[in-house]
Regions:
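Conserved short alpha-helical segments that host acidic/polar catalytic motifs at enzyme active sites
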Residues: 1-248, 252, 261, 267-300, ...
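Internal active-site segments that recognize and position negatively charged phosphoryl groups
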Residues: 253, 257, 307
């Protein structure tokens, strides 16, 4: 669900990263951020909302447009922790020398967090991802690749990550387990991304990482290993797609892509929202109290297109599991009606982008 882009080379890193994030916007997200290492200094910018907002915030630091070096950036879809600047990636260790962007779910993050807090580490966010930079900082002994490998061995779950450090300017370390990562090979520059679409303006030569692969990339070199630190070779593939085709992957059109991605989409939606130890759901951003939820006796869902179809699935679950009468409305028609909304009715407008006009207009009462 989230997007990752990393760059090391001759260009100013921040503009490359922001352009890469724009090419990943179709994946959906609620916040964004970037970190750049230049002159052995770590620069970081994060914001809630669209990449355009991140670009505006970054514009308040004019030096970012000029700093050549390496950097990483990320668009986040909240799982652990609500959408906020603190919870947005990249996450840094306490010293501010290691920055990490992460896709996936760290299933044992609570155990790792308690262990780190017991050693005096202070956390800034509510996310599972923040344990990673702290683990890397604790394992660092002069080689970033080795420190990242040591940290990853402690993780249970899935990850696609990119890491930079002010201690090793020009180096981006990346790794994958269950979350896609692809390296783009340029001339005097190299990139890493979660999706080929972010790489196409700069290169058509790519290396797909396998699960368990870890790589350190510089502007002119890729050091690729497995998690046991054994050097490995991967085929260099040539991409002849355009940007539109890249977004569709290997599918002829988006409809087929969305159909076959449904199992993965459902899994991603559930990840991080179930506390198996407590047997409860984690609903970050839900502002209704348990008392208010108990008073709900009817649910109305409004959406357009695929959002409406998601609502239709929700209708079955609400009625089957919660025993609450539920109806689904076409948002384009709902806004022009004067629907009967009784007391204790929960209305849920759905929009994949958060900007669907019909859902938004009904939400604000137009």
């Amino acid at each position: 669900m989230c997007g990752i882009i990393g760059y090391t080379g001759k260009l100013a890193a921040a503009p490359v990263l922001i352009e890469g994030l724009k090419r990943l916007e179709y994946r959906g997200y609620d916040s964004a951020g970037l970190a750049v290492v230049a002159d052995e200094h770590m620069y970081q910018v994060k914001s809630v909302g669209k990449v355009a907002q991140l670009e505006a915030v970054a514009g308040q630091q004019p030096e970012l447009k000029k700093l050549a070096g390496c950097g990483i950036a990320h668009t986040r879809w909240a799982t652990h922790g609500a959408p906020s600047t603190l919870n947005a990636h990249p996450h840094l260790d306490e010293s501010g020398r290691f920055a990490v962007v992460h896709n996936g779910i760290i299933e044992n993050y609570q155990e790792l967090r308690k262990h780190l807090e017991g050693k005096g580490v202070h956390f800034r966010s509510q996310t599972d991802s923040e344990v990673i930079p702290h683990l890397i900082a604790g394992a660092y002994e002069g080689d970033l690749l080795s420190a990242v490998a040591a940290a990853l061995k402690q993780l249970d779950g899935t990850y696609g990550i990119a890491v930079i450090s002010s201690l090793e300017p020009g180096v981006v370390v990346t790794a994958r387990k269950g979350s896609p990562i692809v390296i783009g090979l340029g001339e005097g520059e190299n990139l890493v991304a979660s999706d080929i679409a972010a790489l196409l303006p700069y290169t058509r030569q790519v290396i797909y990482l396998n699960d368990g692969d870890i790589a350190a990339i510089t502007a002119d070199k890729v050091d690729l290993r497995n998690i046991q630190n054994v050097p490995v070779e991967r085929e260099v593939a040539k991409i002849d797609w355009d940007a539109g085709q890249a977004e569709k992957g290997n599918y002829p059109h988006f409809m087929l892509k969305e159909i076959f991605e449904q199992p993965e989409t459902i899994e991603n939606a559930i990840r991080g929202r179930i506390d198996h130890e407590m047997g409860t759901a984690i609903l970050n951003g839900m502002n209704l109290s348990p008392r208010e939820l108990a008073l709900i006796n009817r649910i109305v869902i409004a959406g357009c297109g695929s959002s409406m179809h998601a609502g239709m699935l929700g209708e079955y679950y609400f009625e089957d599991i919660a025993g609450i009468s539920t109806s689904v409305e076409q948002a384009a028609e709902f806004r022009y009606r004067n629907p009967i909304i009784e007391p204790n009715t929960l209305v849920i407008p759905i929009s994949q982008s958060g900007e669907t006009a019909r859902s938004e207009e009904r939400r604000v009462g137009k």
